Amino acid sequence: MPFEASALDSVARETRPFAAELEPVDWVEPSEMVIHSKQYRVMGQMGEGGMGTIYHAYDPVLERDVALKVMKPGLPGAARQRFRMEALYGARLSHPNLARVYDLGFMPDRGLDWFAMEHLRGKDLDRLLARARQRNMRLSFAIVAHVFGGVLDALEHAHRRGVVHRDVKPSNIFVCRDVEDGRIWSKLLDFGVALDLARHKGPIEICGDPRYIAPEQALGNRPLDGRTDLYAAGITLFELVTGRHPFHDLLEAPSRDLLAAQCERDVPRPGNLLPAAVSKEVRYGLDVVVQRACDKDPDKRFASAADMRTAMLDVLRGAPERHDMTAA
């Protein structure tokens, strides 16, 4: 029921004295810098990456737990730039399937950069896959659809903003549980080698994990775009549904052999490695999704992460589950 005009007039009269107290302050100029000093109480070490050590910390001002990533000492200037860019991307890209970055700073007494980010409780997909293999099991199709669907959502968000991740792989996908509602979430992490297509000028540095790198990323023979990430996503999807890497025979070989395989060998059909209980329709559907994502020619891959997500969900959502395909 709409308010009557007289009622609105009454509210306006009652709030006018309060509004008068909220006149713009004149002791802070628009061009001034507001300087603050943040302090975090370190609770313990959580993990370690190539460029930094991650600590569980507590923010006493906002009364919340955070993950504090501190850059390792002695790294070259290029590594420091990557470290800072990881934080900037985390603050700039806001999506439920990306970890939020709260703050970025510098420790002058130690000469180390740091940033504070969302504190996540869970495990990365690499660990979950290893645990499933130890038990001779696979992740369920339902888990793959939910977890990896979120990753593709995050990639779509980044790609629409001109950011290519360049390091999509299971160890950079974190599976966590929301402490408030108990829901499972996936978070795409580590934008340390990400590429901003709008800002980057000149030659592109070749970087990435040989186990997941796209041919054009390894060779540096053509411009990169979001479809570069879809190749790595296809390799990851193969690993999630089969429990093993498509080029598992080369994982202990020199990196050059693995890079050659990424550029020259077709990715196997995942359907051939699935249990007999999986229907022909699901096998064929997964073959199509993975092989299209992993085509050596970027122009033949999915046009977007959203398209790949739709195709994957069309296959997996109707797939029946069996206990011998579920990792506990």
Which residues does each predicted region cover?
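Conserved N-lobe ATP-binding subsite of Hanks-type protein kinase domains
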Residues: 53
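Conserved short submotifs of the Hanks-type protein kinase catalytic core
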Residues: 110-124
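C-terminal lobe helix-coil module of Hanks-type protein kinase domains
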Residues: 160, 174, 211-327
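Activation segment signature within eukaryotic-like protein kinase domains
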Residues: 147-148
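Protein kinase catalytic-loop region centered on the HRD/HxD motif
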Residues: 151-163
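Short N-terminal regulatory/linker segments that flank and modulate the kinase catalytic core
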Residues: 1-44, 135, 275, 314-315
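AlphaC helix of the eukaryotic protein kinase fold
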Residues: 72-92
